[in-house]
Amino acid sequence: MSQRTVTRRYAAALYEEANANGVLEAVDEDVRMLLESLDSNRPLVRVFESPVIPQDKKDSIVRELLGDRVEDLTVRFLRLLIRKDRETMTEAILDQYQTLRDEQRGIVDAEVTVARPLADETRTTLVGVLEEKTGKEIRLHLHEDADLIGGLVVRIGDRVFDASVRSQLGALHDRLREATLSENALDDGA
């Protein structure tokens, strides 16, 4: 079974249990906190990923660190990951959980690359256009890349819309090359 399939299954199981037990909002907050902790505390990640640290030690670390701070379901879920030897996938599973929750709420991430910073008004307009096109709430992530020259590239999920000057110049270059090759072929044939 692929890692992606495993992360989706565990994330969906956590969501379903949290929903069934009426603790969805609490688990959402736990997941946010855990992801922030894992991101800022690389030694903790190394503990989870270490094959030399026994499962019972990892289990007691989870209980000691999180026991009273998070929802009981969250602790039980993390302990399950340890028992099933899936603790190395914790971060990916929690990320997938957040993606699943965003889908449930109708929120999508839009990765937008621009040549230079956007004015606030332009950013607001862009979000409005993207929300209208997708029918979903947009969470905008802006990146700058001067190589684009101008325009922008938008990635939402697997879809990419490239309206950069760089790509337009590349397309123009390809058309000119084809026209030149066609013209040369005609000249050679005459």
Swiss-Prot record:
Record-linked InterPro entries: ATP_synth_OSCP/delta_N_sf (IPR026015), ATPase_OSCP/dsu (IPR000711)
Gene Ontology terms for molecular function: proton-transporting ATP synthase activity, rotational mechanism
Main localization (coarse): membrane
Keywords associated with the record: ATP synthesis, Cell inner membrane, Cell membrane, CF(1), Hydrogen ion transport, Ion transport, Membrane, Transport
Name of the protein: ATP synthase subunit delta
Subunit structure: F-type ATPases have 2 components, F(1) - the catalytic core - and F(0) - the membrane proton channel. F(1) has five subunits: alpha(3), beta(3), gamma(1), delta(1), epsilon(1). F(0) has three main subunits: a(1), b(2) and c(10-14). The alpha and beta chains form an alternating ring which encloses part of the gamma chain. F(1) is attached to F(0) by a central stalk formed by the gamma and epsilon chains, while a peripheral stalk is formed by the delta and b chains.
Family: Belongs to the ATPase delta chain family.
PANTHER family reported for this sequence: ATP SYNTHASE DELTA CHAIN
Keyword Cell membrane: yes
Compartment(s) of residence: Cell inner membrane
UniProt gene name: atpH
UniProt membrane topology term: Peripheral membrane protein
Role, per record: F(1)F(0) ATP synthase produces ATP from ADP in the presence of a proton or sodium gradient. F-type ATPases consist of two structural domains, F(1) containing the extramembraneous catalytic core and F(0) containing the membrane proton channel, linked together by a central stalk and a peripheral stalk. During catalysis, ATP synthesis in the catalytic domain of F(1) is coupled via a rotary mechanism of the central stalk subunits to proton translocation. This protein is part of the stalk that links CF(0) to CF(1). It either transmits conformational changes from CF(0) to CF(1) or is implicated in proton conduction.
Source organism per UniProt: Salinibacter ruber (strain DSM 13855 / M31)
Cellular component, GO annotation: plasma membrane; proton-transporting ATP synthase complex
Protein origin, superkingdom: Bacteria
